[in-house]
Amino acid sequence: MPADLSGTWTLLSSDNFEGYMLALGIDFATRKIAKLLKPQKVIEQNGDSFTIHTNSSLRNYFVKFKVGEEFDEDNRGLDNRKCKSLVIWDNDRLTCIQKGEKKNRGWTHWIEGDKLHLEMFCEGQVCKQTFQRA
C-alpha cells in the first residue's frame, strides 16, 4: 500500500545540495543563498493525486500531479527549465523521472520512522534531504 506523505515538513538536513545545484547549472550566488535556507514542504495527498508546495524565503515552488500520468512540469523557481515528468509508486516510495534538457534527473520521496526523506538526482549528482513534521 502506498505511503501517506501528507503533512507539513521542515528541512532537518541536506547532503550534497550544492553538487546537485551545480549539475542543474544554478549560478554561484543563488547556490550560496539556497544552501542556507530551511525550506518547508507542504504535501497534500488524496489517493494518487498530489499537490506539493516547497516554500522558502528565497523562492516558492508548486507542483500538482497524479501518479502514473505524465505531465508538463515548469520548474520556474528552481532551475527555470521545463520537462516531462512521470511520478510512480515504487513500493512505498514516490519516484519522479523528469525528461528534458538535463539527463538522469528526478527525485524520490519516502517516509522512514517519523521523517520524510527526499533524494534528488541529476547527471550523476545525488542530494539527500531529511525533513521532520512541522
Curated annotation (Swiss-Prot):
Cell compartment(s), UniProt: Cytoplasm
InterPro entries: Calycin, Fatty_acid-bd, ILBP, Lipocln_cytosolic_FA-bd_dom
Pfam families, per the entry: Lipocalin
Any one GO MF annotation of this record: retinol binding
Keywords: Cytoplasm, Retinol-binding, Transport, Vitamin A
A single GO BP: fatty acid transport
Alphabetized PANTHER family for the sequence: FATTY ACID BINDING PROTEIN
Domain notes: Forms a beta-barrel structure that accommodates hydrophobic ligands in its interior.
Function: Intracellular transport of retinol.
Protein name per the record: Retinoid-binding protein 7
